[in-house]
Amino acid sequence: WSFSVTAIRKGYSKLPSNVKRWINQYIGLNAILSTLEHFTGWIEDGIYQACKRAGMPDWMAWTVAKALTLIAL
């Protein structure tokens, strides 16, 4: 999800300011994306730490965290 949020933010930043203002006023896109980005990162970090505590090597814990986050979120 964080990759999607980054891509949306990049495209959003290229919009004219009046369009961004309208989107923020009626949709609150920035707030939605910030919340999604925050919780997605928080969940992914939690999964990663749990995998590390279970004895997985870094690469495996990272892969499992990314895969589970992609599937679940």
Language model: regions and residue ranges:
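Mature secreted bioactive peptide module from preproproteins
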Residues: 1-73
